[in-house]
Amino acid sequence: MQSIRIAVLALALCFGASLLPVQSHAAAPLPKVKIETSMGDIVVELNPAKAPKTVSNFLYYVKSGFYNNTIFHRVINGFMIQGGGHTADMQEKANSRKPVVNEAGNGLKNDAYRTNDPDSATAQFFINVANNDFLNHKNETPSGYGYAVFGKVIQGQDVVDRIKSVSTGSYGPYQDVPKTPVIIKSIVPVQ
């Protein structure tokens, strides 16, 4: 009899709970930024759930105006376009923050770049122009750690395609530098 009472009580609780109003918790929209370039605009949707430290770091540089009047300084068609760290005369901008911990193990596919030190990311970023799965996280060795993905292009892929096709050459010690600078006029948050 005791077990029947418990079962009836459990059913009553379940039924009663089903009458409570359901509260909708719509997910907050993902943050977006507009990269205004000399060749057009690119909108990137960021993923703070998968790469919170990387997104926070990137947005710090965005909001501080760090990227204003920098360039895409390395362009390799079939691979990526890299920017955010040099001015049009190829002077490297000084980073104001410490590198962030690499969040490459987040399950996203590669859209960002780093050196052989897995925790060296500061302000520079790149946008893949091909499926570069060899850059994805494989293990926690320097060569296998991968590159943290923190966003994706949602508008302006045609601009990315135009940038990846520019003529490039050498500039001092740098390779794959656009012969005509591709200016990042600004990067700003958008709704």
Model-derived regions, located:
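Cyclophilin-like peptidyl-prolyl cis-trans isomerases
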Residues: 2-7, 14-191
